UniProtKB/Swiss-Prot annotation:
GO molecular function term, any single one: glycylpeptide N-tetradecanoyltransferase activity
Catalytic residues of the enzyme: L447
Classification via InterPro entries: Acyl_CoA_acyltransferase, NMT, NMT_C, NMT_CS, NMT_N
Domain of life: Eukaryota
Phylogenetic classification of the source organism: Eukaryota, Fungi, Dikarya, Ascomycota, Saccharomycotina
Protein name listed in UniProt: Glycylpeptide N-tetradecanoyltransferase
Family statement: Belongs to the NMT family.
Length: 447
């Protein structure tokens, strides 16, 4: 395969990482369609493109749970609704098979997401989860699961306002049924079920531009095992560079530089307090209680990893977490999988007591985050991860370039359903480069 072909292959593979072609400066001319072309979304309570927002808050606040039908919309005759009991191993296996065979795959069928059962248990069952919010569509005759969507409860803070909502995720329709327009019906059905609990807002993300993003962040990628990435044709050799040079460029120390260590149950109280104080700087953020924080952050082997740094007095001053979502490599004689780490939540007290954007506060935080995230990359590499991904959300712009994260080819858009909101900075400038000065005001991270 030529280097040009490898470059094209890389562009295709990046889409697997939720990196879709997206150019913030060209949304209007390239990705954004006329509102009338959004046959489904034009009927929903979402902010229209170019809508002048005068006040933040719910778009439609007139409905009550008793106004919502007790029965779902009818499906085509060959299909039936189901509630997926993810506590049942067989039903969880159905979700596992559907996602791993249909969620995302490159055109050559070389790489495929490998959602583990442990990952699904973590992502689908946080505190307060509802079985009836795990919505499926099955073939009547065979009972095969061919469609799925999940909602999980989340309390958001949107510029200081508490917004009781859900996160929508894992929307998946079998690849052979994409023409049946099951996705809009799945969205309507999970909305109906959530509305019955008197919840009217939702947060979701995607690479496709819909009406209307509240924020857009860019992906960045840090090779941890460049040699393997090259061997499996996940990355190309840049012009005027040798393999030896590329391997040397991305080589990390064998062990962390700081006294970082695995977060344990005994650290949760301090880390939770640190997290809440740190997150207050962001305009779109989760409002976790301690049980939710414990669920999402404490280490689960092969799923999520969290680490803390303590000062000389034993106080937790920093924590960092990342989750693992590998690819299966199909028909490769050398490798069966590709390890991928995703930046999750972190916090540091480095700039506490300073204005967030002051020169001194910024420099203190930049230095601390460079140490913290570099150690996270080392730990991820030692866990056999081959690439580390991060968005430009949170304060990530302070370390991305310094730590050799390369800008990805696409963007992740954040959407609030049934909620008007002024735009929130996503950590990128108009020319799409990392915005170290303004950074991002998006604090929430979705799987």
């Amino acid at each position: 395969m030529s280097e040009e072909d490898k470059s094209k292959k890389l562009e295709e593979l990046l889409k697997l990482l939720k990196v879709h072609d997206g150019d913030l400066s060209k949304f209007t001319s390239q990705q954004r369609k006329d509102m009338n072309e959004y046959k489904f979304w034009k009927t929903q309570p979402v902010t229209k493109f170019d809508e002048v927002i005068k006040k933040e808050g719910p778009i439609d606040s007139s409905k009550r749970p008793e106004d919502i039908p007790d029965t779902p919309l009818p499906l085509l005759g060959d299909f039936e609704w189901c509630t997926v009991d993810v506590n049942d191993e067989k039903q969880l296996e159905d979700v596992y098979v559907l996602l791993n065979e249909n969620y995302v795959e490159d055109k050559d069928s070389t790489f495929r997401f490998n959602y583990s059962r442990d990952f699904l248990n973590w992502g689908l069952k946080p505190p307060g989860w509802k079985e009836e919010w795990q919505v499926g569509v099955r073939v009547k005759e065979t009972k095969r699961l061919v469609g799925f969507i999940s909602a999980i409860p989340t309390n958001l803070q949107v510029r200081g306002n508490d917004v009781r909502s859900v996160e929508i995720n894992f929307l998946c329709v079998h690849k052979k049924l994409r023409s049946k327009r099951l996705a809009p019906i799945l969205i309507k059905e999970v909305t109906r079920r959530v509305n019955k609990y008197d919840i009217w807002q939702a947060l979701h993300t995607g690479g496709v531009v819909l009406p209307s993003p509240v924020s857009s962040c860019r992906y960045a990628h840090r090779p941890l095992n460049w040699s393997k990435l090259y061997d499996v044709e996940f990355t190309a050799l840049p012009a005027n560079a040798t393999k030896t040079q590329m391997i040397a460029k991305y080589t990390l120390p064998k062990t962390p530089i700081s006294n970082i260590k695995l977060m344990e149950e005994r650290h949760v109280d301090e880390a939770f307090e640190l997290f809440n104080k740190y997150q207050q700087r962001f305009e779109l953020r989760p409002n976790f209680d301690k049980e939710e924080f414990r669920h999402w952050i404490l280490t689960r082997e092969d799923v999520v990893y969290s680490y803390i740094i303590e000062n000389d007095e034993g106080k937790v001053t920093d924590f960092v977490s990342f989750y693992s979502l590998p690819f299966t490599i199909i028909n490769n004689p050398l490798y069966k999988d590709l390890g991928i780490g995703y930046m999750f939540y972190y916090a540091s007290d480095a700039d506490f007591g300073y204005d967030r954007f002051s020169a001194e506060g910024t420099e203190r935080l930049r230095k601390r985050l460079n140490l913290l995230i570099n150690d996270a990359c080392i730990l991820a590499r030692n866990l056999k991860m081959d690439v580390f991904n991060a968005l430009t959300s949170q304060d990530n712009a302070l370390f991305l370039e310094d730590l050799k994260f390369g800008p990805g080819d696409g963007f992740l858009n954040f959407y609030l359903f049934n909620y008007r909101c002024f735009p929130i900075t996503g950590g990128i400038k108009e020319d799409q480069t990392f915005d170290v000065e303004k950074r991002s005001n998006v604090g929430v991270v979705l799987l």
